[in-house]
């Protein structure tokens, strides 16, 4: 699969042959869904909790005698049916993460890359080094490339000026190649890879 390489200013910088085993697969929605679910579950803090009837500050004295009143039998004001009582079967602090095989995670990344290539929303740029960290200049560059919602993947390190200029732009995410992930790829309309990122990905899946 051959793809044209562009510059940040919209000029041509040659072409690149992409590996079909990484960028040419038929995307499977089920694999992508499993990976997104895995990522979102893993990032949950799981710190949700409520007070049950042993935690609330209520008297444990019996409200009234057991028999003879005609009312229902009650033993404590901390019961869930009373105002201020404890919550029954409420959420507790727990870990939401679940396992997903390493091979499935790797395959999901290939399918995410392939989905962008198949829908022509994959752009390869030669480099993302810039001289200025001004956001206004970066917005003008992105307008030339037609980018309004994009994930930009640099090499092992992202140019500092580029990162500072892009971080204030809505719907533009910038990551080093080791931070590439399925969820961030799918949540943006366009995926932008540098030549170094493509080389690193092909080396990773060799």
Swiss-Prot record:
<comment type="similarity">
    <text>Belongs to the universal ribosomal protein uL4 family.</text>
</comment>
<keyword id="KW-0689">Ribosomal protein</keyword>
<keyword id="KW-0694">RNA-binding</keyword>
<dbReference type="GO" id="GO:0003735">
    <property type="term" value="F:structural constituent of ribosome"/>
</dbReference>
<dbReference type="GO" id="GO:0006412">
    <property type="term" value="P:translation"/>
</dbReference>
<dbReference type="InterPro" id="IPR013005">
    <property type="entry name" value="Ribosomal_uL4-like"/>
</dbReference>
<dbReference type="GO" id="GO:1990904">
    <property type="term" value="C:ribonucleoprotein complex"/>
</dbReference>
<comment type="function">
    <text>Forms part of the polypeptide exit tunnel.</text>
</comment>
<dbReference type="InterPro" id="IPR023574">
    <property type="entry name" value="Ribosomal_uL4_dom_sf"/>
</dbReference>
<keyword id="KW-0687">Ribonucleoprotein</keyword>
<dbReference type="InterPro" id="IPR002136">
    <property type="entry name" value="Ribosomal_uL4"/>
</dbReference>
<dbReference type="GO" id="GO:0005840">
    <property type="term" value="C:ribosome"/>
</dbReference>
<comment type="subunit">
    <text>Part of the 50S ribosomal subunit.</text>
</comment>
<comment type="function">
    <text>One of the primary rRNA binding proteins, this protein initially binds near the 5'-end of the 23S rRNA. It is important during the early stages of 50S assembly. It makes multiple contacts with different domains of the 23S rRNA in the assembled 50S subunit and ribosome.</text>
</comment>
<dbReference type="Pfam" id="PF00573">
    <property type="entry name" value="Ribosomal_L4"/>
</dbReference>
<dbReference type="GO" id="GO:0019843">
    <property type="term" value="F:rRNA binding"/>
</dbReference>
<keyword id="KW-0699">rRNA-binding</keyword>
<protein>
    <recommendedName>
        <fullName>Large ribosomal subunit protein uL4</fullName>
    </recommendedName>
</protein>
């Amino acid at each position: 699969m051959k793809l044209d390489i562009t510059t940040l200013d919209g000029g041509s910088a040659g072409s690149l042959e992409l590996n079909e085993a990484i960028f040419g697969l038929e995307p499977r929605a089920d694999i992508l869904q499993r990976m997104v679910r895995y990522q979102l579950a893993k990032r949950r803090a799981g710190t949700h909790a409520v007070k049950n009837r042993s935690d609330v500050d209520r008297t444990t004295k019996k409200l009234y005698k057991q028999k003879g009143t005609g009312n229902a039998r009650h033993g404590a004001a901390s019961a869930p049916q009373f105002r201020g009582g404890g919550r029954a079967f409420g959420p507790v602090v727990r870990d939401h993460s679940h396992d997903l095989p390493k091979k499935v995670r790797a395959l999901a990344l290939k399918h995410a890359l392939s989905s962008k290539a198949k829908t022509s929303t994959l752009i390869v740029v030669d480099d993302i080094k810039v001289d200025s960290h001004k956001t206004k200049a970066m917005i003008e560059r992105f307008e030339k490339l037609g980018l309004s919602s994009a994930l930009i993947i640099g090499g092992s390190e992202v140019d500092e000026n580029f990162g500072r200029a892009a971080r204030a732009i809505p719907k533009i995410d910038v990551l080093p190649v080791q931070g590439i992930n399925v969820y961030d790829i799918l949540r943006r309309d366009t995926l932008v890879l540098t030549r170094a990122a493509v080389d690193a990905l092909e080396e990773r899946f060799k």
